[in-house]
């Protein structure tokens, strides 16, 4: 039975039983602490947690969810039952049926005949486990279903009691196993041998609430839930393995075709030895996982989801090369896995080119890294072995990472294959030093000096009290003063200084928002604050110019925010949140924030996305953003726990470290909810119009949108309007007629360029006729050698040489031409006909000789070579040398 048929039978079974079929969610959800969806129930969490009412008429649902688990990537292929990507088929009940219903549904599908729509498994080969104290489930299996008591085994909390690992719903579970036969292991049921007895379905009975605790079995059960729910998960791949009669999940109809292609590309044979078998399985598994991640919008990167994808793709490439592959392989692997997966995921067809583009680009970059890095690793490994040691030092691992881009995981794998360990502590220490240097360099740029220990006293004992959320003016005591990076007790007019205050209303740069501008006042003393930076997370450093007067440590001053600056900065920051929300509406949840910068009237927003945005997409994003502005929504600030913020659906930067208490900015209810410590407007209409300037690439898989807000947006739009009107006036048309007018002019220009090109081509053909007629003969080979000063570019020169070659195609002939462009450089081309090449007269050899006389370098293939020279005056001498070589 093919995998797609197993999927259909599962869905049909539960739809007939009144469940609503729910499409698989993306592998990428908004949860900042969840790399990928890793269980079938994840998209249903809000219903299980009681945060939302389930929208299913009968209170039941079924889905086949895409899942990725990457905790044990190194184990892929070693165990033959686990994949990094898998399809979890599940049925869910929200306060409807419970244990008996879940058990009955599962048994009917598994043991029902194929003719009746079931999977046709032999009931005599099915075993079940239940939680140690779950007499109810054991009795249902035995009395209602008829499973003999000897095939019902009881296990403790670690195996048969489910929770999410945090306080919330939990409950006992019952697992269904299939006995694959004595050839796979010992008798005795799942307790005795979980290789012979393969788990295929887990039924979770959510009936209790879990309290605090750690691990799978060290937590308190607080009490019963108001409603009893069902969450089940059947592994599609494992059932396919059984129904298709293959030894493991890598040999099913979905993955075996990739192994077949790997055999063709490498010359190795699957099944001959354990090491190669693991590599074949890695290729098959990772090709599918990588393809599905790219499908859902992940791009290779150096952290988070992008790092996982990069690691998977690089393991494929390296495994293929260890098996004997030469050159590029990913395109064929990806095409094969897309063919097998498209019947279940038709959206692959529309994304095929994008998936290939991402994979091929990553492979191209890594192949360069692999060659140079592998050579260094092998040298270091040999040195270690020859010294009698077994540990590759941290410095070598760091160099592989820092210079050659080798992820430490790859170095660890290669070391293990070579029988070596890696000094991971030494590696981590060097990485920490590098990060510290980078931070110090960045801080030095911000503060004008690199020694940050000077702030230690204030960081430890006097963290700044920030008052700027509530007020723009604060009276405060001066705790410290710095001038030229040194502590001082007083400052005077004209100095550039840093001021440490007890409390401040000025915002310190963070979260992409620039530091406030403002003043520090005391009597006649005026300090102009040019920037505010943070040291650590709690100390505000005010960079200021003493405009008049002076200050001493201990003085009480008034710190004042420039209200115009703050207002415009708030407009930009809240505008960034709206653009982020609009982006996700248009592009989907994979368009996650990669960085931002907000300053008065201007914002830029970086996000993970592989392709440039179309004008239509940009227009839609701008329209959604401005509709949100026009809606005059309240902008609410909520201070709450991190757990509660996540429960609200607040977006966060993946991998960012947040405290237990966080600040949530909510605009328009569910439209935009983000964790943010910045300053914001109180109503969305205060942002004013948002004008998107455009979008661009700022790195592999990262795009950037730039926009103006508020008054700057008005100014930009007015400037654009004036520009359009000026252009329309100069063309003597109305502004709305400009597109047609420009299109007409563009077409005229294209026509003129074509006419010029045609004329140029005719001139070249005429010139070719004359050059062929003037050919001389050297050692039985015709030679056309000419300086053509009226041919300025390499394209025309190559065309002329190709034309001459074609006219002399039936005889041995060599063509050598040199031109001269407007800058004085001399492009040159050397060509040879097939007959000449066959006789040993090669264009690339003559190009090198000629280049020596005209101060140039040339290279290429035997039939056509080219180069660029600085001085064509030596052409005649060069041709004489070519003649001599031809006559030799």
UniProtKB/Swiss-Prot annotation:
Cofactor note: Binds 1 zinc ion per subunit.
UniProt entry keywords in alphabetical sequence: Aminoacyl-tRNA synthetase, ATP-binding, Cytoplasm, Ligase, Metal-binding, Nucleotide-binding, Protein biosynthesis, RNA-binding, tRNA-binding, Zinc
GO CC annotation, single: cytosol
Enzymatic reactions: tRNA(Ala) + L-alanine + ATP = L-alanyl-tRNA(Ala) + AMP + diphosphate
Binding site for Zn(2+): 573, 577, 676, 680
Biological role: Catalyzes the attachment of alanine to tRNA(Ala) in a two-step reaction: alanine is first activated by ATP to form Ala-AMP and then transferred to the acceptor end of tRNA(Ala). Also edits incorrectly charged Ser-tRNA(Ala) and Gly-tRNA(Ala) via its editing domain.
Family: Belongs to the class-II aminoacyl-tRNA synthetase family.
PANTHER family per UniProt: ALANINE--TRNA LIGASE, CYTOPLASMIC, ALANYL-TRNA SYNTHETASE
The protein's name in its UniProt record: Alanine--tRNA ligase
Protein species of origin: Corynebacterium diphtheriae (strain ATCC 700971 / NCTC 13129 / Biotype gravis)
